[in-house]
Amino acid sequence: MKIKYLFYIGVATLALSGCNDGFLERAPEAINDKTFWNTTGDLETYANQFYSYLPGGVTSIADGESDNQVPNSIPQFFWNQLSTPAEAASWCNWSKGGWQPIRLVNYFLTHYQTVSGKESEINQYVAEVRFFKAMQYAGLMRTFGDIPWLDKDLGTGDTDILYGPKLKRYEVMDKIIEEFDFAIQWLPEKPATGRIGKDVARQLKARTCLHEGTYYKYHTELGWADKADRLLKMAADETDAIMATGKYEIYNTGHPEKDYYDVFVMEDKTNLKEAILPVTYLDGKRKHGMSRTLAEANTGFSKDFVESYLCLNGKPITGNDQYKGDTNMKDETTDRDPRLKQTILTWDFPTRVTVATNDSTYIEKEEDFISQYCLTGYKSIKYFIPTDKAFEANNNTYDGIAYRYAETLLINAEAKAELGTITQADLNKTINVLRDRAGMPHLTLEVGFTDPNWPAWGYSLTPLLQEIRRERRIELAGEG
């Protein structure tokens, strides 16, 4: 039976809903700092509001600001359209929406000390709140680089702090790590249904460390290359810790032609071991409309992305006898990594299924891939169910995945490859587990080929790192 996943949403005024009976019994006019901050139930109630910031876990069109996907309208990040204004205002999330979560966290950290209870129970909720601070700051840091670090609840008179100096990006990162480490220390290994635990914090810390570690390493103009290995080691260590729990595994029933697709459209993901944090949707409680969104003309995958899929023999398309060319969709997807046909709309995947009559429609003309569905012709089918009921607006109840174990394995392999410590055993526990699901040949340390179409990153990469990045691009396609 599907278990309800609650996204706890509240407001900063403490007019919050939750399972704290003592809170519910208080008259609204009695809710203030003196009457609220008393029990661990109060802490839980306050922490609930931050759960709305977690990913909804049902998108496959979130790569529009990368080389992987092309939106129907040109993003402002492309074609030199983006300019930095003299004042930030609401530019690129420098706004109330970007900073309000930080204020709400700091308000909590200023007031929770009056609560009575066991240290472990109190710190569990402090850990939740500090996790969300780390998550929010990581996003702001990626967008803006150097930013202020706010660690107290501010008033209108705190102008010296509000308009104070920024910290360097790497200094902000050190602060973020402190927040993650506290969360990892105090969050439970086995959290209650719907709440975050240690592994969610480990995953997001590892993701952030890999991003920043490679950013420092390859942006040599910053002069921070000496700081990279420490972060890459953290990424490897945290994902090692997740893998060592033995709680997670890649969904694989031995059907490479459908297992990858099935992960995303599976109705109930409560017991899916690939989901570090499943996101539950229930009829009458919380639903989404991703199938309807994907059915309409929308963001498409790029030609460059589609050409990055290997052929069934584990080699790139250039000079490969298995590659049939791109005259039509059937040729282009034949004898390719099976994940390609489970990611993009093809000639043999139904665009609509009428359940009552068991009637299905398919693409009949090659030009319809572009004229009816997306400008690139490569429409996403991840998280897409073509039944007539699924097409109803906001009527989908199949679960999402906020944090996926596949990413854990990819982070682990890439971090170790960047450090130069990766072994074939590491590849077999990470990249090759993903390839086993897809029925693809294993990746070896030597790689065994050179691809003339490897991306030009602006710096040199080993063939192994190129292939690990290819695997990330394919496996996490459209997930943002």
Regions from the PLM with identified roles:
Residues 3, 15-41, 176, 206, ...:
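Bacterial Sec-dependent N-terminal signal peptides
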Residues 39-56, 74-144, 160-174, 178-193, ...:
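Conserved, well-structured interaction surfaces
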Residues 141-143, 148, 191, 211-220, ...:
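Short coil/turn linking the two alpha-helices of tandem helical-hairpin repeats
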Residues 146-169, 216-234:
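Short coil/linker segments at helix-helix boundaries
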Residues 207, 211-213, 234-329:
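Polar, glycine-rich mid-to-C-terminal structural blocks
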